[in-house]
Design a protein with these regions (language model features):
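Short, conserved charged micro-motifs
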Residues: 14-15, 77-81
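Short glycine-/small-residue motifs
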Residues: 114-117
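Conserved active-site tyrosine of GNAT-family acetyltransferases
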Residues: 15, 19-20, 84, 112
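Vicinal oxygen chelate
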Residues: 1-3, 25-72, 81-108, 119-123
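Conserved beta-strand-loop-alpha-helix junction that forms the acyl-donor binding cleft
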Residues: 9-11
Protein backbone atom coordinates (compact mmCIF):
# COMPACT_ATOMS: atom_id res chain seq x y z
CA UNK A 1 0.00 0.00 0.00
CA UNK A 2 1.17 3.52 -0.74
CA UNK A 3 -0.09 6.81 0.70
CA UNK A 4 -0.08 10.04 -1.29
CA UNK A 5 -1.45 13.23 0.22
CA UNK A 6 -3.44 15.86 -1.69
CA UNK A 7 -3.44 19.43 -0.40
CA UNK A 8 -6.27 21.54 -1.85
CA UNK A 9 -5.28 25.17 -2.38
CA UNK A 10 -6.65 28.29 -4.00
CA UNK A 11 -3.27 29.36 -5.50
CA UNK A 12 -0.72 26.77 -6.63
CA UNK A 13 2.16 29.26 -7.00
CA UNK A 14 1.79 30.53 -3.42
CA UNK A 15 1.52 26.96 -2.13
CA UNK A 16 4.67 25.92 -4.02
CA UNK A 17 6.53 28.89 -2.49
CA UNK A 18 5.35 27.87 0.99
CA UNK A 19 5.90 24.10 0.79
CA UNK A 20 9.04 24.36 -1.36
CA UNK A 21 11.01 27.35 -0.11
CA UNK A 22 9.28 27.61 3.26
CA UNK A 23 9.27 23.98 4.39
CA UNK A 24 11.98 22.58 2.14
CA UNK A 25 9.98 20.01 0.15
CA UNK A 26 11.32 19.19 -3.32
CA UNK A 27 9.05 20.38 -6.14
CA UNK A 28 9.91 18.18 -9.16
CA UNK A 29 6.79 19.21 -11.12
CA UNK A 30 4.93 22.54 -11.10
CA UNK A 31 2.05 23.16 -13.47
CA UNK A 32 -0.64 25.86 -13.51
CA UNK A 33 -3.29 23.73 -11.76
CA UNK A 34 -1.15 21.36 -9.70
CA UNK A 35 2.31 20.59 -8.40
CA UNK A 36 4.08 17.52 -7.10
CA UNK A 37 5.99 17.94 -3.84
CA UNK A 38 8.25 15.30 -2.31
CA UNK A 39 9.67 14.82 1.18
CA UNK A 40 11.84 11.71 1.31
CA UNK A 41 9.63 9.01 -0.20
CA UNK A 42 6.36 10.82 0.66
CA UNK A 43 4.52 12.42 -2.27
CA UNK A 44 2.22 15.43 -1.81
CA UNK A 45 -0.04 16.66 -4.62
CA UNK A 46 -0.80 20.37 -4.44
CA UNK A 47 -4.11 20.79 -6.27
CA UNK A 48 -5.91 24.00 -7.26
CA UNK A 49 -9.59 23.69 -6.36
CA UNK A 50 -12.00 26.26 -7.81
CA UNK A 51 -15.67 26.91 -7.06
CA UNK A 52 -18.02 24.46 -8.77
CA UNK A 53 -19.93 25.27 -11.98
CA UNK A 54 -22.89 26.65 -10.03
CA UNK A 55 -20.60 29.19 -8.41
CA UNK A 56 -21.04 27.48 -5.06
CA UNK A 57 -17.85 27.17 -3.08
CA UNK A 58 -16.86 23.53 -2.79
CA UNK A 59 -14.13 24.20 -0.24
CA UNK A 60 -13.80 26.98 2.28
CA UNK A 61 -10.24 28.14 2.91
CA UNK A 62 -10.97 29.79 6.25
CA UNK A 63 -8.68 28.50 8.96
CA UNK A 64 -10.00 25.30 10.46
CA UNK A 65 -8.82 22.17 12.20
CA UNK A 66 -9.90 18.80 11.00
CA UNK A 67 -9.39 15.35 12.50
CA UNK A 68 -6.48 14.90 10.08
CA UNK A 69 -3.63 17.38 9.68
CA UNK A 70 0.04 17.25 8.71
CA UNK A 71 2.91 17.23 11.23
CA UNK A 72 6.36 17.99 9.82
CA UNK A 73 9.20 16.94 12.14
CA UNK A 74 12.09 19.41 11.93
CA UNK A 75 15.52 19.80 13.54
CA UNK A 76 15.38 23.61 13.97
CA UNK A 77 11.83 24.84 14.54
CA UNK A 78 12.83 28.52 14.70
CA UNK A 79 14.58 28.42 11.31
CA UNK A 80 11.72 26.56 9.60
CA UNK A 81 9.08 28.89 11.09
CA UNK A 82 11.07 31.89 9.84
CA UNK A 83 11.27 30.44 6.30
CA UNK A 84 7.59 29.42 6.34
CA UNK A 85 6.48 32.92 7.35
CA UNK A 86 8.70 34.50 4.67
CA UNK A 87 7.07 32.17 2.12
CA UNK A 88 3.51 33.25 2.96
CA UNK A 89 2.61 31.11 5.97
CA UNK A 90 0.90 32.40 9.11
CA UNK A 91 1.86 31.48 12.68
CA UNK A 92 -1.41 30.76 14.49
CA UNK A 93 0.07 31.04 17.97
CA UNK A 94 3.49 31.35 19.54
CA UNK A 95 5.77 28.33 19.40
CA UNK A 96 5.02 25.99 22.30
CA UNK A 97 8.26 24.77 23.88
CA UNK A 98 8.96 22.02 26.37
CA UNK A 99 11.73 21.76 28.93
CA UNK A 100 13.63 19.10 26.96
CA UNK A 101 14.45 21.26 23.92
CA UNK A 102 11.44 20.31 21.82
CA UNK A 103 8.59 22.41 20.56
CA UNK A 104 5.56 22.71 18.31
CA UNK A 105 4.36 25.48 16.01
CA UNK A 106 0.84 25.69 14.60
CA UNK A 107 0.84 27.36 11.18
CA UNK A 108 -1.47 27.92 8.23
CA UNK A 109 -0.33 27.65 4.64
CA UNK A 110 -1.30 30.50 2.26
CA UNK A 111 -4.68 28.82 1.59
CA UNK A 112 -5.46 28.43 5.30
CA UNK A 113 -4.68 24.71 5.65
CA UNK A 114 -3.40 23.90 9.13
CA UNK A 115 -0.03 22.24 9.64
CA UNK A 116 2.16 21.63 12.67
CA UNK A 117 5.92 21.83 12.86
CA UNK A 118 7.30 19.54 15.56
CA UNK A 119 10.82 19.64 16.94
CA UNK A 120 11.23 16.44 18.96
CA UNK A 121 12.68 16.78 22.44
CA UNK A 122 16.36 16.06 22.79
CA UNK A 123 17.04 12.66 24.35
Amino acid sequence: MKLEICIDVDDVDRAVEFYGRGLGLEIPQHEKEWAKAVLGEQVFWIMKIDPGPSGAILRDYKRHWTPIHLDFHVDDIDAVVKRALAAGGKLDREIQRNTHGGGMANLSDPSGNGIDLVQPAKK
